[in-house]
């Protein structure tokens, strides 16, 4: 009654975990009539409608995060996190969370394919000057806006993030 694969006048796109890739989303054509008071389990509406947020796969071998500034709705296989860390831009945090360092940390510290908020909160995030963040964000934007194969861009960004941790 609420979910549909057909776009109608009273529904909107809803994302599942499998719709989330690193840095991006590929909606699979699912729509929802958003009536939160009728749902069994729903996050606070402000989280869905936040000006910017990160979406991530709840179940995944490695952390997979995407940036959303379109107030997109999501099902419970696609969780929301809104990093509010003084001095750190959200897209910078996105790059850190999508890095091989974060994946390694999660794999060694937690024995689970479920990525919990408490796991994310324990990932150490390098505090860097704004010019370094801007450089990272430019590359994140390139990855997010590219229609070409982004594996090379991703590897270069990941190498730089490894350096931010002093691990190179």
Model-found features: residue ranges?
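Polybasic, glycine- and aromatic-enriched phosphate-binding surface used to engage nucleic acids
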Residues: 1-134
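Non-catalytic DNA-recognition/assembly elements of restriction-modification systems
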Residues: 1, 17-18, 127-168
């Amino acid at each position: 009654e609420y979910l549909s694969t057909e776009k109608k006048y009273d529904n909107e796109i809803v994302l599942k975990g499998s719709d989330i890739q690193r840095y991006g989303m590929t909606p699979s054509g699912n729509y929802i009539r958003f009536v939160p008071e009728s749902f069994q389990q729903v996050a606070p509406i402000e989280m869905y409608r936040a000006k910017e947020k990160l979406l991530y796969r709840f179940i995944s071998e490695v952390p997979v995060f995407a940036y959303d500034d379109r107030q997109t709705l999501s099902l419970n296989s696609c969780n929301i996190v809104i990093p509010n860390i003084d001095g750190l831009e959200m897209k910078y945090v996105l790059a850190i969370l999508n890095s091989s360092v974060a994946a390694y940390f999660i794999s060694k510290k937690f024995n689970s394919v479920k990525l919990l908020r408490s796991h994310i909160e324990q990932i150490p995030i390098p505090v860097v000057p704004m010019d370094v963040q801007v450089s990272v964000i430019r590359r994140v934007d390139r990855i997010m806006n590219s229609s070409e194969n982004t594996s090379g861009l991703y590897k270069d960004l990941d190498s730089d993030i490894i350096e931010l941790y002093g691990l190179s």
